[in-house]
């Protein structure tokens, strides 16, 4: 991807996340956790060999992505006509249309102001590019050349991952491939069960933090979370979080995405040698009230969700650090990072 993408966001910043999942959609290897499960919950069409699905709309895929500039490519992996796995990747596009360049307007009050919305759609049908669909999408962004090359890079990466899955199946057989995936998921489950027992107490811990301002003079916005353990299961309850914002700082947080945050956070601190995947998700229960900053009602604006995302890591770090400050990173910082966009025209007409 880094060699074939064109935009600096993907090529230099690396704002893209690959994954390979089993046929049920659980990520076995990857970086960001699986967004296939939330997608499958909302997708009603058939899935056939050669199909490649594109989406960017949080409201149409149960927040498998959380704002419109993140374009998701999903490839079902088939071998001899049988669905055996998934490969998927999302990348942040430099522009998605909407009212400002970069497509993250702080003054947006609805998602309709933030650019083109792509429901889960077959970009390829049985291996054939739907070129009219692609041109329609690119006609609505300010950086069509960058987006085209970046999208092609995501598709090529997913196809390469799918090819490697098929090669493994041919070499070792389906049973070995499936059992290996199950073992990798189970190892992660066992590791996280131990970590949860070590660092999450049965008595509730509570922490809250704030987004001071949304850039439109409104705020602060409270993010509150209560954490405790029931048996082997960790519970995170965001009751008490403020209602959704009128501006774009809302973060439509899928429950599985928060599980990924929790897992990657703790694994990287406690034992970075553990392979991170979705195997532990049954050990975590996440509760997010509807209509809040973290689960806004449609059509709330979402483009500026990065600030709330960072603050969630601050809250999570504080909760975990209460009981183990020597082990857990508990210093805030990411949510205070500035996000600046610069654009303009060069000497070429219209560029």
Question: Where are these predicted regions, by residue range?
Answer:
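Glycine/proline-enriched, intrinsically flexible loops and inter-domain linkers
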Residues: 1-49, 54-79, 83-351
């Amino acid at each position: 991807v880094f060699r074939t993408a064109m935009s600096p966001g993907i090529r230099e910043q690396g704002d893209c996340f690959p994954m390979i999942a089993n046929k049920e959609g659980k990520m076995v290897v990857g970086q960001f956790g699986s967004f296939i499960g939330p997608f499958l919950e909302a997708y009603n069409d058939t899935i056939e060999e050669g199909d490649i699905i594109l989406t960017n709309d949080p409201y149409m895929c149960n927040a498998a992505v959380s704002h419109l500039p993140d374009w998701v490519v999903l490839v079902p992996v088939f071998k001899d006509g049988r669905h055996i796995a998934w490969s998927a990747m999302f990348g942040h596009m430099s522009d998605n249309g909407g009212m400002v360049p970069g497509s993250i307007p702080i003054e947006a009050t609805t998602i309709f102001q933030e650019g083109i919305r792509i429901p889960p759609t077959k970009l390829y049908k049985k291996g054939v590019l739907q070129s009219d669909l692609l041109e329609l999408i690119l006609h609505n962004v300010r950086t069509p050349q960058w987006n085209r090359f970046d999208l092609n890079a995501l598709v090529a990466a997913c196809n390469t991952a799918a090819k490697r899955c098929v090669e493994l199946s041919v070499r070792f057989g389906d049973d070995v491939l499936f059992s290996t995936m199950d073992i990798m998921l189970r190892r992660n489950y066992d590791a996280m069960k131990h970590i949860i027992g070590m660092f999450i107490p049965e008595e509730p811990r509570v922490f809250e933090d704030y987004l001071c301002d949304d850039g439109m003079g409104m705020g602060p916005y409270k993010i509150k979370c209560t954490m405790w353990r029931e048996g082997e299961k960790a519970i995170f309850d965001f009751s008490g979080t403020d209602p959704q914002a009128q501006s774009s700082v809302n973060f439509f947080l899928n429950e599985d995405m928060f599980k990924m945050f929790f897992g990657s956070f703790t694994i990287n601190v406690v034992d970075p040698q553990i392979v991170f995947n979705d195997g532990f998700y049954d050990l975590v229960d996440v509760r997010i009230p509807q209509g809040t900053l973290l689960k806004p009602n449609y059509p709330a604006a979402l483009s500026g969700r990065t600030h709330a995302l960072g603050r969630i890591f601050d809250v999570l770090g504080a909760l975990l650090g209460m009981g183990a400050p020597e082990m857990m990173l508990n210093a805030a910082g990411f949510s205070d990072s500035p996000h600046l966009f610069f654009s303009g025209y060069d000497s070429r007409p219209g560029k």
